[in-house]
């Protein structure tokens, strides 16, 4: 979020909010929302979902970004962004752009996965060498390339929106 903010902050009135600290409805409404979250159970995390509903972000123009513990090419990343999109569309929001990149996996998640794998060898997130490798790789993300790609994505989107608004 900070990297995107640094890239776009001079393109208009832009605010960076810490949603964990935002417990009441903002007095200010925005023309456009860029909403970023980390993945939890193939969707935006509960803090972001609560924020969206608390702030009544319904029927708005939005762009979404999401970090996911797996590489972008993994089906879990697609499922996660698609569920986030569906969550937003259920609230009649218009989605102009999405961005997904790999992000860190909380070590506590792996502990839970190991316990659940021990209990049920068919557990959907069974701890395998491949999963362990993905989690190890996730510690490096978002990396400088991920951050630059996110900056470019939203910078280009806003430049396009501004140029069309002025035309």
Report the location of each language-model feature.
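A short glycine-rich beta-strand->turn/loop micro-motif centered on a GG-aromatic cluster
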Residues: 14-22
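Short amphipathic alpha-helix with an adjacent loop that forms part of the alpha/beta core around
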Residues: 22-29
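Short amphipathic alpha-helix
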Residues: 2-4
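FMN-binding flavodoxin-like domain, especially the glycine-rich phosphate-binding loop
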Residues: 7-15, 32-35, 40-167
